[in-house]
């Protein structure tokens, strides 16, 4: 079960968060098999069904408490099973919406209760419990991988003293059998998968276009692509959708229906969400079933299309049959034999996993995602695209057209590597992690003479003696090895294998010559990949132990070049390279002293520099960062940071900058007093060093103590002065980022105001890249929390560019700009400008943004806008559908969105007409539904919203009817004074209704309110006293009525 879920299920990308299962046929098939297994478990294995899990399986369920009947204790918001463990804890506990289940028996019953919603529940459970084996049987059973067999599990459990070991053994075996079943089932499913190619889709569309137009004799009214641009692989979908297998999107107008927006993908054809009204972009979400091709889809959707196709006798079968034949061909005998040989010695599960990967390679190797655009519009006079080139300054790579000339051995090797990479740890790496497709020189290409000369030298390397080898290496270095032609000439004739073999000889001169060449050519991304494929990295890691300092330096520099992608970084770590590289940093014992004439000391410094360079490349992996820390890298880096050698400082600070994203490192950086040296190096003349120091400060300044250290060591002034140089955008982004994070502290903001940094930041609001704008706006958002700075921003003309940025699409930028605009809106003069520029409408439109952070930030920004606008009530009503939109946001699952919307509703409800409108839109039941929350921020603003909404019609009574009063009384037990004040005011308003007074009294409100009457907060005093007065008045009236 664990292996199948980890290897076969297809997940969406989720940034730094957890992904969700994609809605694909394979995922649905896996979930259905799991449901069948769990449903039948209670009948087939009644004894094992009672076994209590080590940890409960938890997820958010869509089931309501009312769905549970006999066998459960049901209340309004909770459900407990009558079945309990030996400690009396229920085996099923539901507290809407979270559910916790601790036995297979309760899982089986839940699926029976879910009925038609069982697939949704299974999906939610799998998404929330990525490693169910550990939760069911404990962390000791996390070793149940592909190579686990029955004897392994049996041996493990029989060594355990747990009296339930026999049941655990049976469950472990059952889960293992389920895992094997899922792998076999998926193998069959994958082998039958549809795999359309861009060429097939294009031919179908072109043929349909020929028979489209007005009139009854055509099959369609029209068919057209949504995009005129075509990539070099034949796809028209954007690259981030090509990764999901999507080829293109077409708009089809049949004779007998509305226009359909259709997605054509490698997995088939389906209806998507259509074009959006606002931007005209495609809503990529699938809205129906997947069909094997476009014609089958249209036959199903349009009877007229099917009828006219039959009349015209159009046949798509010939081309499609060819495609099917190519797809359906069994792997060639040589490939099958190689596959068997490759996996010999492994068990049955490994064989099946390799077969799955092999079939996937067979189905997808005809086309791969591409970033190279080509247009179908005829632009005359334009040259053809250049061949792949690497930008030496930025290291960015323009991806070439995929090669189809891969050898069979390479195909099998890559398949095995993909399995290994899936099992290995993943890391959140922002650098170039893509391995470039292989790219061979074409035989017919016009190659320069150097290409052939280098190939001759490689032959001497292969067959010559030691002297000839050294001469050949020296001669090869005379060529311009920075040119791609020379690099690929060495590779194409087998020179890389020879150079790597030379590293295993005992001749130091041969090793040095080989490493010098490898260091130069490993700047090429393809060469880097080839070096890893040929096993060159472990050999270089071993050379780091050499007593020869020149060898150490060259090996470390070459590792630094090669470790630019994830697989290479993993290989370095797995062969002990991180520990050895950290040890190189200890060579520079005297690095803190001025450079001396001693060659020995200069070499020590160079060894440390090369080690730092390699660690910089390796530190882009989360696991490697932790390995560097455990190997004692931080104290050594801190010592090297005091050096006067500028070329040493850049890789040292670069490594610290990468590692500072980890909390453990930030604490260690403070402990080692590194901030002081980072600040000192901000005054360096070297722009790259300044950039990395600023970036390291940006990463560390999340912590208040670090922000104070930057100020105390005089770091704010150089940061402010660096804002004036805007030519170097990378440095400007780092500097503005550091200023943003430092501005979180008010003391730092005061200093920035002294240094005139706020005026400079306002000047950077235009004509800058988004990376800079995000940081500039973030810094202004923090600075504008103070009145003096808001005035500066307004007087410098900063309001208009801020409002202009509200129409962007960058999520981080929108979050920051809404915060900045909201901060400025506190000042009435600034609010007038925002209103005149239509800023409030733009903020309101951001409530439709799909990102919760943007929605929340926009809602917070609306609060001061509504509060300080001249005619706020009329302004809000002028937004068509605006009030309904904000009320509907109360259905969100995000706590920050809910809190911000409640705050906005509090301000909106100050106008009676608006309060009447939102009441009609159902604000009362939605607010009441949120009352059972433990989040103090949400409680505060929710109570304020309820208090304000009570002032219309019979809303007070309605809140009581929707059970909002009792949860509000519990808020008085909170330790937050803001919650107390808002709650007391809400209860005072609600106590105007007699039924609510009774509910408050029954829930112990009087005692809690009496304590608050003595509060130093006057508003809290008055509200608490008023509420007690109303309750007392009702009690007296009741008493009087009883005796009369």
Swiss-Prot record:
Residue segments, region Disordered: 316-348, 378-446
Lineage of source species: Eukaryota, Metazoa, Chordata, Craniata, Vertebrata
Residue ranges of ARM repeats: 484-523, 525-564, 535-577, 622-661, 663-702, 746-785, 828-867, 912-951, 953-992, 994-1033
Role description: Component of the outer dynein arm-docking complex (ODA-DC) that mediates outer dynein arms (ODA) binding onto the doublet microtubule. Involved in mediating assembly of both ODAs and their axonemal docking complex onto ciliary microtubules.
Name of the molecule in the record: Outer dynein arm-docking complex subunit 2
Name of the gene encoding the protein in the UniProt record: ODAD2
SUPFAM superfamilies: ARM repeat (SSF48371), Hypothetical protein c14orf129, hspc210 (SSF103107)
Entry's Gene Ontology cellular component terms: axoneme; ciliary base
Oligomer and partners: Component of the outer dynein arm-docking complex along with ODAD1, ODAD3, and ODAD4. Interacts with CFAP61.
Biased composition (Basic and acidic residues): 319-348, 384-401
Domain of life: Eukaryota
Reported tissue expression: Expressed in respiratory epithelial cells (at protein level).
Residues found modified as N6-methyllysine: 552
InterPro entries (UniProt xref): ARM-like, ARM-type_fold, Armadillo, GSKIP_dom_sf
Organism: Homo sapiens (Human)
Compartments reported by the entry: Cytoplasm, Cytoskeleton, Cilium axoneme; Cytoplasm, Cytoskeleton, Cilium basal body
Noted disease: Ciliary dyskinesia, primary, 23: A disorder characterized by abnormalities of motile cilia. Respiratory infections leading to chronic inflammation and bronchiectasis are recurrent, due to defects in the respiratory cilia. Patients may exhibit randomization of left-right body asymmetry and situs inversus, due to dysfunction of monocilia at the embryonic node. Primary ciliary dyskinesia associated with situs inversus is referred to as Kartagener syndrome.
PANTHER family on file: ARMADILLO REPEAT-CONTAINING PROTEIN 4 ARMC4, OUTER DYNEIN ARM-DOCKING COMPLEX SUBUNIT 2
Keywords assigned: Cell projection, Ciliopathy, Cilium, Cilium biogenesis/degradation, Cytoplasm, Cytoskeleton, Kartagener syndrome, Methylation, Primary ciliary dyskinesia, Repeat
GO BP, sorted A to Z: cilium movement; determination of left/right symmetry; heart development; outer dynein arm assembly; regulation of cilium beat frequency; ventricular system development
């Amino acid at each position: 079960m664990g292996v199948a879920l980890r290897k076969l299920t297809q997940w969406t990308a989720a940034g730094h968060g957890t992904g969700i299962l994609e809605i694909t046929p394979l995922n649905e098939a896996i979930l259905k098999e799991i449901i069948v297994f769990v449903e039948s478990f209670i009948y087939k294995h009644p004894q094992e069904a009672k076994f209590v899990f080590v940890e409960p399986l938890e997820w958010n369920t869509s089931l309501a408490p009312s769905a549970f009947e006999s066998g459960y204790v049901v209340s309004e918001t909770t459900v407990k099973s009558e079945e309990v463990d030996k400690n009396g804890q229920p085996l099923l506990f539901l507290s809407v919406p979270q559910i916790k289940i601790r036995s297979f028996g309760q899982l089986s019953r839940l699926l029976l209760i879910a009925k038609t919603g069982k697939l949704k529940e299974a999906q939610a459970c799998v998404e929330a419990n990525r490693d169910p084996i550990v939760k069911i049987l404990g962390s000791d059973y996390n070793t149940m991988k592909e190579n686990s067999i029955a004897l392994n599990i049996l041996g493990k459990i029989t060594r355990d003293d747990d009296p339930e070991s026999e049941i655990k053994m049976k469950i472990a075996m059952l889960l293992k059998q389920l895992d094997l079943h899922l792998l076999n089932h998926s193998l069959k499913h994958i082998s039958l998968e549809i795999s359309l190619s861009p060429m097939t889709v294009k031919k179908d569309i072109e043929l349909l276009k020929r028979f489209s137009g007005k009139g009854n004799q055509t099959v369609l009214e029209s068919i057209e692509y949504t995009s005129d641009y075509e990539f070099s692989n034949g796809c028209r979908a954007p690259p981030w959708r090509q990764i999901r297998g999507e080829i293109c999107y077409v708009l089809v107008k049949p004779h007998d229906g509305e226009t359909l927006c259709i997605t054509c993908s490698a997995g088939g054809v389906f209806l998507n969400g259509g074009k959006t009204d606002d931007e005209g972009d495609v809503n990529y979400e699938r809205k129906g079933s997947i069909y094997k091709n476009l014609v089958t889809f249209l036959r199903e959707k349009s009877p007229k299309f099917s009828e006219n196709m039959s009349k015209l006798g159009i046949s798509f079968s010939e081309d499609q049959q060819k495609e099917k034949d190519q797809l359906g061909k069994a792997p060639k005998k040589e490939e099958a034999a190689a596959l068997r040989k490759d996996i010999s010695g492994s068990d049955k599960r490994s064989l099946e996993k390799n077969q799955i990967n092999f079939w996937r390679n067979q189905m997808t190797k005809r086309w791969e995602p591409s970033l190279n655009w080509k247009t179908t519009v005829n632009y005359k006079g334009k040259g053809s695209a250049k061949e792949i080139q690497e930008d030496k300054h930025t290291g960015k790579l323009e991806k070439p057209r995929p090669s189809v000339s891969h050898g069979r051995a390479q195909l099998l090797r890559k398949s095995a590597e993909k399995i290994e990479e899936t099992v290995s740890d993943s890391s959140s790496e922002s650098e170039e992690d893509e391995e470039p497709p292989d790219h061979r020189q074409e035989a017919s290409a016009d190659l320069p003479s150097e290409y052939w000369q280098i190939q001759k030298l490689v032959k001497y390397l292969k067959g010559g003696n030691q002297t000839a080898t050294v001469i050949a290496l020296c001669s090869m270095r005379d060529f311009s090895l920075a040119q791609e032609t020379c690099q690929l000439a060495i590779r194409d004739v087998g020179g890389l294998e020879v150079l790597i073999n030379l590293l295993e000889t005992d001749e130091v001169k041969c090793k040095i010559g080989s490493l010098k060449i490898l260091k130069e050519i490993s700047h090429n991304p393809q060469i880097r990949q080839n070096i890893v494929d040929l096993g060159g990295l472990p050999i270089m890691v071993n050379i780091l132990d050499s007593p020869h300092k020149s060898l150490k330096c060259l090996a470390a520099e070459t590792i630094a070049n090669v470790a630019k992608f994830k697989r290479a970084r993993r290989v370095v770590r797995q062969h002990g390279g991180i520990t050895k590289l950290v040890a190189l940093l200890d060579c520079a014992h005297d690095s803190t002293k001025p450079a001396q004439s001693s060659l020995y000391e200069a070499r020590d410094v160079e060894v440390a520099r090369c080690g730092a360079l390699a660690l910089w490349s390796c530190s882009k992996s989360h696991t490697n960062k932790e390995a560097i820390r455990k190997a004692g890298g931080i104290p050594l880096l801190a010592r090297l940071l005091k050096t006067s050698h500028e070329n040493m400082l850049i890789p040292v600070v670069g490594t610290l900058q990468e590692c500072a994203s980890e909390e453990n490192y930030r604490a260690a950086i403070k402990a080692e007093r590194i901030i002081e040296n980072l600040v000192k190096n901000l005054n360096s003349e070297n722009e790259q060093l300044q950039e990395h120091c600023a970036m390291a400060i940006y990463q560390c300044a999340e912590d208040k103590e670090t922000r104070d250290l930057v100020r105390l060591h005089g770091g704010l002034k150089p940061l402010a002065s660096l804002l004036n140089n805007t030519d170097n955008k990378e440095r400007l982004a780092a500097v503005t980022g550091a200023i943003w994070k430092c501005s979180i502290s008010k003391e730092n903001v005061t200093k920035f105001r002294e240094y005139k940094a706020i005026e400079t930041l306002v000047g950077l609001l235009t004509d800058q890249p988004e990376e800079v704008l995000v940081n500039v706006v973030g810094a202004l958002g923090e600075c504008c929390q103070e009145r003096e700075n808001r005035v500066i921003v307004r007087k410098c003309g900063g309001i208009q560019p801020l409002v202009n940025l509200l129409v962007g699409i960058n999520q981080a930028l929108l979050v920051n700009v809404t915060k900045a605009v909201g901060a400025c809106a506190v000042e009435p003069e600034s609010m007038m400008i925002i209103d005149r520029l239509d800023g409030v409408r733009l903020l309101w439109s951001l409530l439709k943004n799909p990102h919760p952070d943007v929605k929340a930030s926009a809602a917070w920004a609306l609060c001061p806008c509504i509060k300080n606008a001249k005619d706020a009530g009329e302004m809000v009503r002028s937004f068509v559908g605006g009030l309904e939109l904000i009320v509907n946001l109360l259905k969100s699952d995000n706590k920050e969105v809910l809190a911000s919307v409640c705050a906005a509703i509090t301000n909106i409800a100050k106008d009676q007409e608006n309060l009447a409108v939102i009441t009609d839109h159902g604000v009362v039941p939605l607010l009441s539904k949120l009352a059972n929350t433990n989040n103090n921020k949400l409680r505060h603003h929710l109570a304020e919203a309820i208090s304000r909404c009570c002032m219309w019609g019979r809303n007070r009574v309605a809140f009581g009817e929707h059970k909002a009063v009792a949860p509000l009384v519990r808020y008085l037990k909170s330790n937050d004074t803001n919650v107390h004040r808002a709650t007391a005011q809400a209860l005072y308003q609600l106590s105007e209704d007699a039924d609510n007074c009774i509910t408050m009294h029954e829930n112990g409100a009087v005692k809690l309110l009496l304590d608050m009457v003595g509060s130093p907060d006057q508003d809290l005093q008055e509200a608490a006293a008023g509420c007690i007065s109303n309750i007392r008045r009702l009690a007296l009236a009741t008493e009087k009525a009883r005796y009369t």
